[in-house]
């Protein structure tokens, strides 16, 4: 089983490294998506750079990456801790893809795919909460930030009604997913548009809004040419 786990973790990282947003932007617009819009290699920036239809495709693809690898782990009868390791590797691949010199996306939808396969109810919360309460105010990233804090608490305190059979492993898995998100946001290269932003504010903006400045519109277009 150890060999299977190691191989699936490696496979998860490689599958996660497939940069759908980058490939779509290259194919449809002939551009490097990292140099346009917000610069993020993800579905949201695909919407800005390429368009709605292809943004939907990238969303489905990125969710599918995470879900597929957990499904493979389930087929091998792995426990929750082992499945979480595979899922985390897939998200790390998306965030730091070997195929793009480790300059990837934020892993939001890949994380959603992983969470949904680990616990459908937690996946539902992770999807509904940001879009129900924050999308009307165009602050989905803030919703993602808060729901990622809520999920481990929910897994720990409400595991029985949610049908979570391995609450400790699930809770720890959710905490690690939160940490991966935080590390990804804080280690992203600083954008020139934020050169006058104090470090404390920069960290706050990244943790809460996943951007370097407070102005959302200016951020999503700061690399547009």
Regions found by a protein language model. Name each.
Residues 48-73:
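Multi-pass membrane catalytic core of lipid/isoprenoid biosynthesis enzymes
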Residues 1-8, 68-85, 116-123, 157-172:
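Helix-coil boundary and interhelical linker segments in multi-pass alpha-helical membrane proteins
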Residues 21-24, 92-103, 129-137, 185-189:
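C-terminal ends of transmembrane helices
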Residues 124-126, 140-149, 163-178:
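Loop-to-transmembrane alpha-helix initiation sites
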Residues 47-50, 73-76, 93, 108-139, ...:
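Interfacial segments of multi-pass membrane proteins
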Residues 2-32, 184:
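N-terminal signal-anchor transmembrane alpha helix
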Residues 31-42, 98-115, 139-150:
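Short, non-helical or kinked segments that cap or interrupt transmembrane helices
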Residues 23-53, 191-225:
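Cytosolic, membrane-interface loops and tails of multi-pass inner-membrane proteins
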């Amino acid at each position: 089983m150890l060999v299977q786990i190691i191989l699936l973790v490696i496979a998860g990282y490689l599958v996660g490294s497939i940069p759908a947003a980058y490939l779509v932007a290259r194919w449809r617009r002939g551009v490097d998506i990292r140099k346009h819009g917000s610069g993020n290699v993800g579905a949201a920036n695909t919407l800005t750079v390429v368009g709605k239809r292809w943004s939907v495709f990238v969303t489905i693809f990125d969710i599918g990456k995470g879900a597929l690898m957990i499904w493979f782990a389930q087929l091998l009868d792995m426990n929750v801790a082992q499945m979480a390791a595979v899922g985390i590797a897939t998200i790390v691949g998306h965030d730091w893809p070997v195929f793009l010199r480790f300059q990837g996306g934020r892993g939001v939808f890949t994380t959603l795919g992983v969470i949904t396969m680990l616990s459908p109810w937690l996946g539902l919360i992770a999807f509904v909460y940001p879009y129900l309460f924050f999308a009307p105010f165009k602050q989905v990233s803030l919703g993602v930030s808060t729901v990622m804090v809520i999920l481990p608490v929910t897994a720990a305190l409400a595991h029985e009604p949610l049908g979570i059979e391995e609450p400790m492993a699930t809770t720890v898995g959710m905490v690690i997913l939160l940490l991966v998100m935080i590390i990804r946001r804080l280690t992203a290269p600083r954008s020139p548009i934020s050169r006058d932003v104090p470090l404390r504010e920069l960290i706050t903006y990244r943790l809460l809004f996943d951007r370097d400045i407070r102005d959302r519109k200016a951020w999503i277009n700061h690399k547009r040419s």
